[in-house]
UniProtKB/Swiss-Prot annotation:
Disulfide bonds, paired cysteine numbers: none
S1 motif domain ranges (all copies): 135-199
Designated gene of the protein: nusA
Name recorded for this polypeptide: Transcription termination/antitermination protein NusA
Lineage of producing organism: Bacteria, Bacillati, Bacillota, Bacilli, Bacillales
Job of this protein: Participates in both transcription termination and antitermination.
Pfam family, one: KH_5
Subunit record text: Monomer. Binds directly to the core enzyme of the DNA-dependent RNA polymerase and to nascent RNA.
Residue ranges occupied by any KH domain in the UniProt entry: 301-367
Positions of the UniProt region annotated as Disordered: 348-382
Source species of the chain: Halalkalibacterium halodurans (strain ATCC BAA-125 / DSM 18197 / FERM 7344 / JCM 9153 / C-125) (Bacillus halodurans)
Keywords, alphabetical: Cytoplasm, RNA-binding, Transcription, Transcription antitermination, Transcription regulation, Transcription termination
InterPro entries in UniProt: KH_dom (IPR004087), KH_dom-like_a/b (IPR015946), KH_dom_NusA-like (IPR025249), KH_sf_prok-type (IPR009019), NA-bd_OB-fold (IPR012340), NusA_bac (IPR030842), NusA_N_sf (IPR036555), S1_domain (IPR003029)
SUPFAM superfamilies reported for this sequence: Nucleic acid-binding proteins (SSF50249), Prokaryotic type KH domain (KH-domain type II) (SSF54814), Transcription factor NusA, N-terminal domain (SSF69705)
Molecular-function GO term, any one: DNA-binding transcription factor activity
Length: 382
């Protein structure tokens, strides 16, 4: 090692952000191991690397004692005072023992240490960068795929998109650019492992936060997301300011905002409904685009019984129960849907017991603004 090597470490520190001092200390520690392995395993030594010219010196560290039992680790008081009269018992004396051919070992060791530390530092920098991006969106480029993962280049690292996190309505080809949600960042022996998703509800949430300024600045709050990726999703939104239309803000002028998100999700249908702290109103809104006649609420069991017009029953339940299922996920309430005629037969339209809260929705509540966006067409259900 020489001054050029030390200059190289200085450059490395500037370009890679790897501390020069940390590398030198690692080299010194590695050289101690190298010395013991090649010259004297039992000796207690210290290796000193000159920070200016890169020269290396090895010192044996010996304890000052009255009587020497192990000359490799101890030195007599008389001999120590011959070096420096100020030494006393229990002091430590350092004696240079640098081997003549130690430079070759030092050069090999230094190269290995620097390579390892650069690799570790780069992995650490990448991990620190991506751990802050958990639960966020990044755009990557599809590289390849196997029967378990699609490998997506995120610039500094390759992320893994598991089969279970891939949308069923889209296929992926080499060099495709995709937006994905970072679900997990883990340290491994091979470096950071980044797991991403195209199906996570967080992807839809972040897309709205990025696309709708009112959500980004807090004017509109996205309260909940329920998603069956690639097919249909529901989100509930709320604004403290009564003059702000949270649904309209998310839809955007002529549906432009939500349509951008629909396009990104390859045509996934999105229902945008108004959130309410009143479970009766919230559940009714969540079942959009279906109309609701009445909602009976059981607070203790967190269940609701929803009555809809006969001609709206199929719409309320949805294909394979999807609309009701998403509404339940969105609100956190169990939902049992019955047609108006069935409810009449069961006497459910009569006054309920005091333990159940009921509300027959008036026309104003039933017409609470919601939006359903399917493909390139944005419309508001009446």
């Amino acid at each position: 090692m020489n001054s050029e090597f030390m200059d190289a470490l200085t450059t490395l520190e500037k370009e890679k952000g790897i501390s020069k001092e940390v590398i030198i200390e690692a080299i010194e520690a590695a050289l101690i191991s190298g010395y013991k392995r090649n010259f004297n395993q039992a000796q207690n030594v210290r290796v000193d690397v000159n920070r200016e010219n890169g020269s290396i010196r090895v010192f044996a560290r010996k304890e000052v004692v009255e009587e020497v039992f192990d000359a490799r680790l101890e030195i007599s008081l008389d001999e120590a005072k011959g070096i420096n009269p100020n030494y006393e018992v229990d002091d430590v004396v350092e004696i240079e023992v640098t081997p003549k051919d130690f430079g070759r070992i030092a050069a090999q060791t230094a190269k290995q240490v620097v390579t390892q530390r650069v690799r570790e530092a780069e992995r650490g920098i990448i991990y620190a960068d991506f751990i802050d991006r958990e639960e966020d969106i990044m755009t990557g480029i599809v590289q390849r795929q196997d029967n378990r993962f699609i490998y997506v280049d995120l610039g500094k690292v390759e992320a893994l998109l598991p089969l279970s996190e891939q949308m069923p309505n889209e296929s992926y080809r080499h060099n495709d650019r995709i937006k994905a949600y970072i679900t997990k960042v883990e340290k491994t022996t091979k470096g950071p492992q980044i797991m991403i998703s195209r199906t996570h509800p967080g992807l839809l949430k972040r897309l709205f936060e990025l696309e709708v300024p009112e959500i980004y600045d807090g004017t509109v709050e996205l309260k909940s997301v329920a998603r069956e990726a690639g097919d249909r999703s529901k989100i509930s939104v709320h604004a403290e300011n009564p003059e702000v239309d949270p649904v309209g803000a998310c839809v955007g002028p002529k549906g432009s905002r939500v349509q951008t998100i629909v396009n990104e999700l390859k045509g996934e249908k999105i229902d945008i409904v108004r959130w309410s702290e009143d479970p009766v109103e919230y559940v009714a809104n969540a079942l959009s685009p279906s109309k609701v006649v009445k909602v009976n609420v059981n607070e203790e069991e967190k269940t609701t019984q929803v009555i809809v017009p006969d001609y709206q029953l199929s719409l309320a339940i949805g294909k394979r129960g999807q609309n009701a299922r998403l509404a339940a996920k969105l609100t956190g309430w169990k939902i049992d849907i019955k047609s108006e005629s069935e409810a009449q037969e069961l006497g459910l339209l009569e006054d309920e017991a005091a333990s159940h809260e009921t509300l027959a929705l008036d026309q104003e509540t039933a017409d609470q603004p919601e939006a359903t966006v399917e493909t390139s067409k944005n419309h508001e259900e009446e």
